[in-house]
């Protein structure tokens, strides 16, 4: 190898740490010292000392974070402060004692003030020395830089030049490390010594010489004293020249080259390769749009191995801001760790150690197709996303060569396009494309969001490691199986079961006794069972294929667009039957599930709307429509996990169970007939009061609600009526005349008993609630395990809050409805009679004695004329359903914020926890009122009662609802 005729001693100083911490604190260069020496004689040809003015680039709009590997700090930690200019003494290499210099170590004094005053920008300083070399007719190949270790060039000059977009001449990309050259010089002396043959083995077993750590240590080993030269700002730079001169005069040749790679070369990593774990680091906090070139630029000056940047992907295939970087040796890995909390723009990047197994798990590939694709020697890899599933390689080639933007040709034509497919051969909509030159990258990326057919295509710069990672995931059958421990995570996050200690449960047997008994009977002494919340809303279940799945929706599509796309089939969608799927990041996934009223409707919709186009703005996208079952839908949404199954109803539920099934079928949310009234009411209460809108739940699944006010009011009225009627004593047809007075006063007795019972429940709940929390539904804390899990994940906290509030909203609505009824009983006797006249009071024989004959005659006349009869039914007003905030409340705020009537707790608990009481009240009131009011035959009465039940779920138009028995 040809040895240059001249060497250049390069000394670099920053305004921060120097020595072993040089460049680790991300401070700027303030001094460059160039000394040109002749190799043959060791004489100094010329000297250039250039002060560089720091411009504060590394502290603009951000706070500098110190490195985790810094061993010491300087006395003045300010980065290039605007210091006052004092009289500098260039002869001594220091400034006057006015605080304008930076002492770094025991002897090093940096000319901060002079650099601020007379320094040049870094680009001008580099150009000045390059012009000096040209004036001496010296070319790149005729000189070699010599530095004190690796840090001056790798950690300082190349890093800062890359950040400031300063182009360095080619001779800065190769240099000699003086410390390594000195060690080689000392080892060479031992090798040339005259050693007897018998002692050669001992010499080979001798320990290797340690690497010198400073210029002073080299001077000590050479027995040379420091030279007093007043022409140098820093004495250490002159001592470095002395060491180089000594080696040159001793005949040492600076033949070794330390290279700086400026281009990240692509490479292929097989899963069977052996990777040195001492060469791997993990970078966190990267911008999501960062490419491998951006990461290589962050580590500029350090040599990254071929294909050594592996971008980590999330389970959904998107970049998550992390990357694994593989360097050529441990020395470069150690320097990379010193860039911990250095910056890319305004973001600081964390750098940690990693293992070889971590790198192979991301970058290692086992696909022969990927190996052949990546071995073509392309400099640029572009990832395409959003392709039509039937796209061909010719369409991809035409995409990059046609249009208004400059054409860019794909390497090797069709062979330069690789489509990503699933194990069954179906396309995923992704592809990778190769380009030969780096100049093709901006041309290709300039076609971002242009269209192929009716689909716009997203383009990203990719890496060989990302190609391997994507193909490994796409070809792994475990990612598409319904079971197994390695199945892909669910689109809807699964929450741990959350135990919420609500109010003590009131048994059905307590309500069967007379209200004249002690109120303590309403509060059983045993602690209430914890109420487990389902980990996932049960949307639907079963193998009946009455659902459809839409795929390929625009990310901006709303429920209105889906209804318009389905056209006439939209009328077959059940209530709350449109489910927009949202990914773990809270963004639309482009899919939706829709529940239809019949299996035949779903089949026809999938047959006639499949691959039809949806117009969105000025673009058209074809939508795939598939028929599926409720189990299929839950399997996809839960990531292959079995959907939660509703518990079967108690066997003693009769008419009340039929009523709740009727409500469940109307809402469309709970198709299983085995859900409790509490669950049905909770699902109904979740509907916001208002018109058509989209409600996005915190658990990453959005329900499209078409209506909400009518069903929420109907459910509240149903449960309020059941609770109120359960508190009244039973009636018999053989009651005496004195029973009327006692019956009329039953309202006051029930209200008083409810107030007394509420106090007992209050005391019991206080005893069960944790200390320090007020007794209020909104102040009850979640359990410790759930709170600890939610504290680390904001999304989990939001989901738990939503579940907690959904349960509390049901309880609050029931309590509010019962409280309003109790207040009306106490305030106005006339309103009490009006509320219960149609349900129970009209059944009393004494009360109906004067009007029964007139009603029978009127009913007979109306039946003979063929006119329908009407039953007057009341519903609670909107005041019974007060809105409540969807958030947690503090303990103090909860104690004083929401006030509940004394009887509300008992009424709410009775409505929620006493299905048998609801059954009894309905059988005594509603069923009997239907039979007596219509006075028809058995078949006619059954038809009329069925029509009245259907009308329960219809939206009332005013305060009173009139149900036509003939509908």
Curated annotation (Swiss-Prot):
Q: In a knockout, what does one observe?
A: Death during embryogenesis; without displaying dorsal-ventral patterning defects. Heterozygous embryos act as a dominant maternal enhancer of dorsalizing mutation cact(E10) and display a partially dorsalized phenotype.
RRM domain segment(s): 279-356, 380-464
Query: Could you state a single Gene Ontology molecular function term?
Result: mRNA binding
Q: Give the matching SUPFAM superfamilies.
A: RNA-binding domain, RBD
| PROSITE patterns, alphabetized | RRM
Q: Which InterPro entries match?
A: ESRP, Fusilli_RRM2, Nucleotide-bd_a/b_plait_sf, RBD_domain_sf, RNaseH_sf, RRM_dom
Q: Where in the cell is it found?
A: Nucleus
Report keywords, A-Z.
Answer: mRNA processing, mRNA splicing, Nucleus, Repeat, RNA-binding
Q: Where is the composition biased (Polar residues)?
A: 673-687
Ranges annotated as biased composition (Basic residues): 694-708
- Enumerate the residue ranges of region (Disordered): 65-100, 673-716
Protein's GO biological process: mRNA processing; regulation of RNA splicing; RNA splicing
Q: GO CC terms for this protein? A: nucleoplasm; nucleus; ribonucleoprotein complex
Q: Where is the composition biased (Low complexity)?
A: 65-80, 89-100
The main place the protein resides is: nucleus
Q: What does this protein do?
A: mRNA splicing factor that regulates alternative splicing od specific genes. Has a maternal role in embryonic dorsal-ventral patterning; such role is probably indirect and due to its function as mRNA splicing factor regulator.
Q: Its family? A: Belongs to the ESRP family.
| Protein name as annotated | RNA-binding protein fusilli
Q: Which organism is it from?
A: Drosophila melanogaster
- Lineage, broadest ranks: Eukaryota, Metazoa, Ecdysozoa, Arthropoda, Hexapoda
């Amino acid at each position: 190898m040809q040895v240059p005729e001249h060497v250049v001693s390069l000394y670099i100083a920053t305004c921060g740490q120097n020595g072993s911490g040089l460049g680790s604190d991300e401070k700027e260069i303030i001094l460059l010292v160039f000394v040109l020496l002749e190799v043959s004689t060791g004489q100094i040809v010329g000297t250039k000392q250039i002060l560089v003015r720091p411009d504060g680039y590394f502290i603009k709009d951000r706070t500098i974070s110190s490195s985790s590997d810094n061993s010491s700090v300087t006395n003045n930690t300010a980065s290039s402060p605007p210091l006052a200019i004092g009289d500098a003494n260039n002869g001594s290499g220091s400034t006057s004692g006015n605080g304008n210099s930076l002492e770094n170590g025991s002897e090093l004094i940096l000319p901060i003030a002079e650099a601020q005053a007379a320094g040049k920008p870094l680009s001008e300083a580099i150009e000045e020395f390059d012009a000096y070399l040209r004036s001496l007719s010296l070319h790149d190949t005729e000189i070699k830089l010599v530095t004190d270790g690796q840090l001056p060039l790798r950690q300082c000059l190349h890093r800062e030049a890359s950040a400031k977009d300063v182009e360095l001449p080619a001779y800065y990309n190769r240099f000699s490390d003086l410390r390594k050259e000195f060690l080689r010089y000392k080892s060479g002396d031992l090798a040339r010594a005259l050693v007897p043959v018998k002692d050669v083995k001992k010499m080979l077993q001798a320990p290797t010489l340690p690497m010198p750590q400073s210029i002073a240590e080299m001077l000590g080993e050479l027995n040379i004293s420091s030279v007093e030269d007043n022409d140098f700002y820093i004495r250490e730079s002159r001592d470095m020249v002395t060491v180089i001169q000594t080696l040159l005069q001793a005949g040492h040749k600076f033949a070794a080259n330390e290279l700086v790679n400026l281009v990240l070369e692509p490479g292929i990593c097989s899963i069977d390769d052996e990777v040195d774990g001492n060469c791997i680091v993990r970078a966190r906090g990267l911008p999501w749009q960062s490419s491998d070139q951006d990461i290589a630029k962050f580590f500029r000056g350090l040599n990254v191995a071929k294909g050594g940047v592996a971008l980590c992907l999330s389970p959904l295939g998107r970049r998550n801001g992390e990357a694994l970087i593989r360097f050529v040796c441990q020395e470069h890995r150690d320097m990379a760790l010193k860039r911990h909390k250095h910056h890319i723009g305004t973001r600081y990047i964390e750098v940690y150690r990693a293992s070889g197994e971590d790198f192979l798990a991301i970058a290692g590939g086992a696909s022969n197709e990927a190996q052949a694709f990546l071995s073509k020697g392309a400099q640029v890899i572009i990832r395409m996303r959003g392709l039509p599933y039937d796209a061909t390689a010719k369409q991809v080639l035409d995409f990059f060569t046609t249009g208004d933007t400059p054409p860019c040709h794909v390497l090797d034509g069709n062979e330069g396009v690789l489509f990503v497919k699933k194990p069954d051969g179906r396309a995923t909509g992704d592809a990778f494309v190769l380009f030969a030159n780096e100049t093709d990258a901006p041309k290709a990326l300039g076609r971002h969001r242009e269209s192929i057919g009716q689909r716009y295509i997203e383009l990203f710069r990719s890496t060989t490691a990302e190609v391997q990672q994507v193909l490994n995931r796409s070809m792994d059958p475990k990612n598409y199986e319904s079971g197994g421990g390695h199945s892909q995570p669910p689109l809807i996050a699964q929450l741990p079961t959350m135990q919420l200690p609500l109010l003590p449960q009131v048994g059905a047997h307590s309500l069967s006794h007379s209200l004249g008994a002690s109120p303590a009977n309403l509060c059983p002494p045993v602690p209430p069972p914890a109420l487990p919340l389902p980990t996932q809303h049960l949307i639907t279940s079963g193998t009946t294929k009455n659902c459809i799945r839409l795929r390929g929706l625009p990310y901006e599509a709303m429920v209105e667009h889906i209804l318009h796309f389905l056209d006439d089939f939209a009328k077959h969608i059940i209530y709350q039957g449109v489910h927009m799927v949202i990914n773990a990041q809270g963004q639309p996934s482009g899919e939706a599930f829709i529940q239809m009223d019949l299996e035949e409707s779903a089949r026809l919709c999938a047959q006639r709307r499949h691959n039809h186009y949806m117009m969105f703005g000025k673009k058209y996208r074809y939508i795939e429509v598939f028929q599926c079952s409720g189990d299929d839908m839950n399997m996809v949404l839960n990531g292959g996990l079995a959907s939660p199954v509703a518990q079967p109803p108690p066997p003693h539920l009769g008419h009340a169970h039929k009523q709740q099934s009727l409500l469940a079928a109307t809402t469309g949310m709970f198709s299983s007939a085995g859900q409790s009234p509490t669950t049905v009411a909770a699902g109904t209460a979740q509907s916001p009061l208002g018109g058509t809108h989209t409600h996005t739940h915190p658990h990453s699944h959005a329900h499209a609600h078409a209506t909400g006010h009518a069903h929420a009011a109907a459910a509240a009225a149903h449960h309020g009526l059941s609770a109120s009627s359960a508190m009244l004593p039973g009636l018999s047809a053989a009651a005496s005349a004195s029973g009327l007075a006692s019956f009329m006063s039953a309202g006051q007795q029930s209200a008083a008993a409810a107030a007394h019972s509420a106090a007992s429940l209050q005391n019991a709940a206080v005893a069960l609630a944790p200390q320090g929390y007020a007794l209020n539904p909104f102040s009850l804390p979640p359990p410790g395990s759930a709170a600890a899990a939610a504290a680390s994940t904001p999304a989990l906290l939001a989901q738990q809050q939503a579940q907690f509030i959904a349960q509390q909203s049901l309880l609050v609505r029931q309590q509010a409805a019962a409280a309003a009824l109790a207040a009306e009983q106490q305030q106005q006797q006339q309103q009490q009679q009006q509320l219960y006249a149609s349900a129970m009071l009209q059944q009393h024989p004494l009360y109906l004695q004067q009007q029964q004959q007139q009603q029978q005659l009127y009913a007979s006349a109306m039946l003979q004329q063929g006119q329908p009869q009407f039953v007057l039914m009341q519903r609670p007003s909107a005041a019974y359903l007060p809105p409540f905030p969807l958030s947690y409340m503090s303990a103090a705020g909860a104690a004083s914020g929401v006030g509940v009537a004394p009887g509300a707790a008992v009424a709410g608990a009775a409505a929620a926890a006493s299905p048998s009481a609801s059954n009894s009240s309905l059988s005594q009131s509603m069923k009997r009122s239907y039979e007596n009011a219509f006075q028809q035959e058995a078949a006619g009465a059954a038809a009329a009662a069925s029509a009245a039940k259907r009308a329960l779920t219809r939206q009332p138009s005013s305060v009173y609802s009139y149900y036509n028995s003939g509908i």
